[in-house]
């Protein structure tokens, strides 16, 4: 075969490969599109499992056998025919497993690590059931249908954000006027705190030498600070939030509940903890909060511990394994949540965090990976 013939042969092979790739992409797209048509089924079925306490019914069943459909429908007072369909879907999604009973005469359901994370009664640092229930309230779902309006609106902000457009006020004002939603926000934040604070604490040892007081800004129920003072018992903790939140905060050992507004001032302390607060605000407000944090801590040992997501700068080129890819996907979903539910909030890249921290006067900071959706950003007063 001459070099010219070889070149033509290789070109034909390359063209055939390209055609196959196009066909493969088309075939994949013809299936993938359906998850955007019916994607709401995932969250609706998960909410159904939480509402009926299906994971608890399986976990608490007196028999060591898999729980049959008849037993499960009796335990949760559900229609067997409808429950069978819900469970078929959730088994297919990997939330539950269906396996044969020991005698092999029937099949039954068992929990998985994922289904146990849908237990509304569990407060073990794994369940995110309160978060699912909060995000699936009609009040939080409705703004998603207005997402395109804010994307297409002028930069000057003449079009109200999705939540404001639906409810006539921002999410914080709405929560203040509707205690049920405020309670759901607080419980959603608390269940995430139970999950992530142990990871944060594991990355904090050595940071609190000489620290005797710490304020949790936007601390909600106070549970986060309660966990931190248990981990670092020499620290006096202050749970700082708006009056209507502090009014229903827990009374915990080593924690004092203090009402106030982070936009006005923050109680003086050695260190500040602020988790999932700054992403609720645009750069201008974020810088103001950070400046108030900086003013509240002393020059020598003062530090601000920020627990927030850090979005990768280079998209998938930064992703090294499946877990990293899934974590990044959650961070990007959170950014969509901020667009739907807050007026100016957003998730930030490291470059964007660098900007707001330096604008607030923090010349030095570090980012510690805690193998989670969130990272620990430590900003030093000096």
From Swiss-Prot:
Compartments annotated for it: namely: Cytoplasm
Q: Which GO terms describe its cellular component?
A: cytoplasm
User: What triggers or suppresses the expression of this protein?
Assistant: Expressed following a circadian rhythm with the highest level 4 hours into the light and the lowest level at the end of the night. Induced by cadmium. Induced by osmotic stress.
Q: Which UniProt keywords apply?
A: Cytoplasm, Melatonin biosynthesis, Methyltransferase, S-adenosyl-L-methionine, Transferase
Q: Which SUPFAM superfamilies match?
A: S-adenosyl-L-methionine-dependent methyltransferases (SSF53335), Winged helix' DNA-binding domain (SSF46785)
Q: Disrupted gene: resulting phenotype?
A: Altered circadian dynamics of stomatal aperture. Promoted seed germination. Increased susceptibility to Botrytis cinerea.
Q: In which pathway does it act?
A: Aromatic compound metabolism; melatonin biosynthesis; melatonin from serotonin: step 1/2
- Glycosyltransferase as a keyword? no
GO-annotated biological processes: circadian rhythm; defense response to fungus; melatonin biosynthetic process; methylation; negative regulation of seed germination; regulation of stomatal closure; response to mannitol; response to osmotic stress
UniProt catalytic activity: N-acetylserotonin + S-adenosyl-L-methionine = melatonin + S-adenosyl-L-homocysteine + H(+)
Active site (catalytic residues): 279, 308, 347
One MF annotation (Gene Ontology) recorded for this entry: acetylserotonin O-methyltransferase activity
Identify its protein family.
Belongs to the class I-like SAM-binding methyltransferase superfamily. Cation-independent O-methyltransferase family.
User: What biological function has been recorded for the protein in this entry?
Assistant: Methyltransferase which catalyzes the transfer of a methyl group onto N-acetylserotonin, producing melatonin (N-acetyl-5-methoxytryptamine). Does not seem to possess caffeate O-methyltransferase activity. Implicated in melatonin-dependent circadian dynamics of stomatal aperture to minimize night water loss and promote drought tolerance. Prevents seed germination by promoting melatonin biosynthesis. Promotes melatonin-triggered defense responses to the necrotrophic fungus Botrytis cinerea. (Microbial infection) Promotes melatonin-triggered defense responses to the necrotrophic fungus Botrytis cinerea.
Can you name this protein?
Acetylserotonin O-methyltransferase
In the record, what lineage is assigned to the organism producing the protein?
Eukaryota, Viridiplantae, Streptophyta, Embryophyta, Tracheophyta
């Amino acid at each position: 075969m001459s070099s010219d013939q070889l070149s033509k042969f290789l070109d034909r092979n390359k063209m055939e490969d390209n055609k196959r790739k196009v066909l493969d992409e088309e075939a994949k797209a013809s299936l993938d599109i359906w998850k955007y048509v019916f994607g709401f089924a995932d969250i609706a079925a998960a909410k159904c499992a939480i509402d009926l306490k299906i994971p608890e019914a399986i976990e608490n069943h007196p028999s060591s056998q898999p729980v049959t459909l008849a037993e499960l429908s009796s335990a949760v007072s559900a229609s067997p025919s409808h429950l069978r369909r819900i469970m078929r879907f959730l088994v297919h999604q990997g939330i539950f497993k269906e396996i044969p009973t020991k005698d092999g005469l029937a099949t039954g359901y068992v929990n998985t690590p994922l289904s146990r994370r849908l237990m509304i009664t569990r407060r073990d640092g794994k369940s995110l059931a309160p978060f699912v229930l909060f995000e699936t309230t009609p009040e939080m779902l409705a703004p998603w249908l207005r997402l395109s309006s804010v994307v297409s609106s002028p930069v000057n902000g003449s079009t109200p954000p999705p939540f404001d457009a639906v409810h006539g006020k921002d999410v914080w004002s709405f929560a203040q006027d509707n205690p049920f939603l405020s309670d759901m926000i607080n419980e959603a934040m608390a269940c995430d705190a139970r999950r992530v604070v142990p990871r944060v604490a594991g990355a904090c040892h050595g940071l609190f030498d000489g620290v005797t007081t710490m304020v949790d800004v936007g601390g909600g129920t106070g549970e986060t600070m309660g966990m931190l003072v248990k981990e670092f018992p020499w620290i006096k903790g202050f749970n700082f939030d708006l009056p209507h939140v502090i009014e229903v905060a827990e009374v915990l050992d080593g924690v004092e509940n203090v009402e106030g507004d982070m936009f006005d001032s923050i109680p003086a302390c050695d260190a500040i903890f602020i988790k999932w607060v700054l992403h609720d605000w645009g750069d201008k407000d974020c810088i103001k909060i950070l400046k108030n944090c900086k003013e509240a801590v002393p020059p020598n040992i003062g530090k601000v511990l920020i627990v927030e997501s850090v979005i990768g700068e280079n998209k998938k080129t930064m992703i090294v394994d499946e877990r990293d890819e899934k974590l990044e996907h959650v961070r990007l979903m959170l950014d969509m949540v901020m667009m739907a539910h807050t007026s100016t909030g957003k998730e930030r890249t490291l470059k964007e965090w660098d900007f707001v921290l330096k604008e607030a006067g923090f010349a030095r900071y570090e980012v510690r990976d805690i193998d989670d959706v969130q990272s620990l950003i430590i900003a030093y007063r000096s």
